Design a protein with these regions (language model features):
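Active-site SXXK
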Residues: 58-59, 82-111, 145, 201-205, ...
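A penicillin-recognizing enzyme superfamily signal
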Residues: 5-55, 64, 70-78, 89, ...
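Short, well-ordered junction/capping motifs at the entry into regular secondary structure
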Residues: 1-2, 188
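Second-shell loop/turn segments in exported
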Residues: 37-40, 75-83, 128-133, 141-143, ...
């Protein structure tokens, strides 16, 4: 922190002790996951990574990695790298929709739409994005759209429900400070972000709408134990508890039965959790950012040179999620963290609805399912 600069010149004379929150065992657990992943990714590429884990409730940094340990440099990718987040940005679109009172049962057509963007020459060109698996379909709920990370649903959301400016405003309210371009392609996470910012921002969902600024040093002492400076936790409410919970619940669907499902069936992580996979257009970035009620963490893998791909099939759920799973599983076990559930606020209710119509059941209803709603948009 810049506040330390005035004391820096006296470091040697006064033998200052910086008391940090970093947990050595947490860093060791992440490094183990990092090394394991490098062996699986393409060895001929200089694959880099960034990782950061925060206390969900306070923003205290538990562990951080700014690059691969066998190729040291002074560039901390966790705090300095600007990378496209891909689908990791989609929760901000859904947050904007929920904040505008759209229920998660809102249905949009899972069919191609055209966008316009500037090409490398600065010229406007037509662009028709698709879902990562090339699939299309019929009417699709917002929940299914995020669960399956459907690009076409995200694009239709910014064209039909929440315009790019509203999505940008939500991201900024949730403390994303890097420039966000308020254009239709915001739906696919094309504006660069810093890993530390998006991880801290995600913790807001799990912390009932309260954003906590990341903090690495709690206080500075001299050799006699006298406190020279203390750093306090900095928090503010940026979302309502209801909006935060609804997005949390959507992100739980992602890891329970969506694109992050391997967290459960393959890596056996059993704590209540939410998260999102992310992959950029040419597979140059692979992300997984997620949280439990106690720890929020994010993993990024990529090449420093933006144009170089990680290789075929290296999606966020394949390249980044395994390291996240290894760290979170070990951290929760080693720290004996209980399987706390996300608290449902008073303004959110669970309602039984018709599985086909997504409305209240009638005498023609064949199948039922339960869904969460804000009290203000429960089906009538």
């Amino acid at each position: 922190p810049h506040e330390c600069s005035s004391a820096a010149s006296d470091v040697y004379k006064r033998q200052l002790a910086y008391l940090s929150i970093f947990d050595a065992d947490s860093v060791k657990m992440m490094l183990e996951g990092q090394v394991e992943l490098y062996e699986e990714l393409r060895k001929e590429l200089l694959v880099q990574c960034a990782f950061i884990a925060l206390d969900t409730k306070t923003g205290e940094i538990l562990a951080m990695i700014g690059g691969r340990s066998d190729y040291p440099d002074e560039f901390n990718r966790a705090t300095q790298a600007l990378r496209q987040p891909g689908s990791v940005f989609k929760p901000y679109i859904y947050t904007a929709a929920i904040d505008n009172n759209y229920p998660v049962t809102t249905q949009l057509l899972n069919q191609p739409v055209a966008l316009y963007r500037n090409n490398a020459k600065g010229e406007r060109e037509k662009w028709t994005p698709g879902n990562y698996d090339k699939s299309t379909g019929g009417l699709t709920t917002l929940r299914e759209g995020l669960q399956k990370s459907l690009n076409l649903i995200s694009v239709r959301m910014v064209q039909e429900l929440v315009p790019p400016r509203q999505v940008k405003d939500i991201a900024q309210r949730m403390q994303i400070t890097t420039p966000i371009r308020a254009v239709d392609s915001i739906a696919l996470g094309t504006s660069e972000v810093k890993p530390i910012e998006i991880v801290a921002s995600y913790s807001t969902f799990a912390n009932k709408g309260i954003y906590s600024s990341p903090i690495a040093i709690t206080r500075i002492e001299d050799k006699y134990g006298r406190i020279i400076k203390e750093y306090s936790i900095d928090q503010k409410e940026v979302l309502s508890p209801e909006t935060a919970y609804m997005v949390t619940n959507l992100l739980q669907s992602v890891v329970d039965s969506g694109t992050g499902g391997s967290l459960r069936w393959k890596y056996k992580f059993r704590h209540p959790a939410g998260g999102k996979t992310g992959t950029t257009q040419n597979l140059s970035d692979a992300w997984f950012v997620g949280f439990t009620p106690n720890i929020t963490a994010g993993v990024w893998y990529g090449i420093d040179e933006y144009s170089v791909s990680l290789g075929d099939g290296q999606y966020g759920g394949v390249a980044a999620l395994p390291a996240w799973a290894l760290f979170m599983k070990n951290a929760h076990n080693e720290l004996n963290i209980s399987k706390d559930k996300f608290e449902v606020p008073d303004g959110v209710v669970e309602v039984e609805i018709d599985s086909d119509t997504k409305q209240l059941p009638t005498n023609r209803t064949k199948n039922l399912e339960k869904e969460y709603f804000l009290r203000s948009n429960v089906p009538q």
